[in-house]
């Protein structure tokens, strides 16, 4: 089964592992797998080399029975050791580089050097606090009080033809995107919807999952309190 087809099936939980933050990334991966996570995202906003991302993906693939997907913070974070890559365009960045500049560079690299990697075009929309991703990409995060603006971006992503949309509250966000915003984006975008950032409890995960995104991502929690992943995964799958 293709990765994209897998993502379309119901609501799944993915664990984000940032090798720049997680020295013992295999320990986190094992916790996530035992908790029942449906996939692993690998990547981060800062400080990761191509050789590092390749080694991490290879190591995780050796113990994982779920897809390993690159969540790139730069064009250097590519490897065929993974199953696929979210080909991100930061729609609400104020810098054209993060909307299309990096993508032109990355597209050439993918075509020449990583032809077997499944590429999923992904509209990346940063909301709320925005975290490191919002800061690095020079974005103007959408306030949680304006789900209508998030929905407008989702409509644009749909009409442009993105295969996926990632609604990002940011790494370590104090709160996740509110259910009202997820609902509005879900209504406007009919393909793969990914929601991440600020999800630290089963209750928060369940509230987001009820709006039927395709993927719910937890990252900071996996780094700081991996024992709690089971609660999150259970909430996602029981919503």
Swiss-Prot record:
Mg(2+) binds at residues 18, 45. GO terms for molecular function: magnesium ion binding; phosphoglycerol geranylgeranyltransferase activity. Sn-glycerol 1-phosphate binds at residues 166-172, 197-198, 219-220. Pathway: Membrane lipid metabolism; glycerophospholipid metabolism. GO terms for biological process: glycerophospholipid biosynthetic process. It is found in: Cytoplasm. It catalyses: sn-glycerol 1-phosphate + (2E,6E,10E)-geranylgeranyl diphosphate = sn-3-O-(geranylgeranyl)glycerol 1-phosphate + diphosphate. InterPro entries: GGGP/HepGP_synthase_I (IPR039074), GGGP/HepGP_synthase_sf (IPR038597), GGGP_HepGP_synthase (IPR008205), GGGP_synth (IPR010946). Pfam families: PcrB. Gene3D superfamilies: FMN-linked oxidoreductases (3.20.20.390). Signal peptide: none annotated. The keyword Nucleotide-binding does not apply. Keywords: Cytoplasm, Lipid biosynthesis, Lipid metabolism, Magnesium, Metal-binding, Phospholipid biosynthesis, Phospholipid metabolism, Transferase. Prenyltransferase that catalyzes the transfer of the geranylgeranyl moiety of geranylgeranyl diphosphate (GGPP) to the C3 hydroxyl of sn-glycerol-1-phosphate (G1P). This reaction is the first ether-bond-formation step in the biosynthesis of archaeal membrane lipids. NCBIfam families: GGGP, GGGP-family, PRK04169.1-2. Belongs to the GGGP/HepGP synthase family. Group II subfamily. This is Geranylgeranylglyceryl phosphate synthase. It comes from Pyrobaculum neutrophilum (strain DSM 2338 / JCM 9278 / NBRC 100436 / V24Sta) (Thermoproteus neutrophilus).
């Amino acid at each position: 089964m293709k990765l994209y087809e897998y993502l379309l099936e119901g609501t799944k939980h993915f664990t984000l592992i940032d090798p720049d933050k997680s020295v013992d990334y295999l320990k986190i991966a094992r916790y996530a797998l035992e908790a029942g996570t449906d996939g692993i995202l690998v990547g981060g906003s800062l400080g990761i080399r191509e050789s590092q991302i390749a080694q991490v993906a290879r190591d995780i693939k050796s113990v994982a029975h779920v897809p390993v997907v690159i969540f790139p913070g730069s064009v250097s974070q590519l490897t065929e050791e993974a199953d696929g890559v979210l080909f991100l365009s930061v729609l609400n960045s104020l810098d054209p580089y993060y909307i299309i500049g990096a993508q032109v560079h990355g597209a050439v690299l993918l075509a020449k050097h990583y032809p077997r990697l499944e590429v999923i075009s992904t509209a990346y929309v940063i909301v709320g606090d925005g975290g490191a991703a919002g800061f690095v990409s020079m974005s103007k995060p959408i306030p949680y009080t304006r789900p209508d603006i998030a929905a407008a971006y989702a409509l644009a992503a749909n009409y442009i033809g993105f295969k996926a949309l990632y609604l990002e509250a940011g790494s370590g966000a104090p709160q996740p995107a509110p259910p009202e915003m997820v609902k509005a984006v879900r209504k406007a975008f009919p393909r793969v919807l990914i929601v991440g950032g600020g999800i630290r409890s089963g209750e928060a995960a369940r509230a987001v999952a009820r709006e039927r995104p395709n993927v719910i991502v937890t990252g900071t929690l996996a780094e700081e309190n991996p024992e709690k992943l089971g609660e999150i995964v259970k909430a996602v799958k029981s919503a």
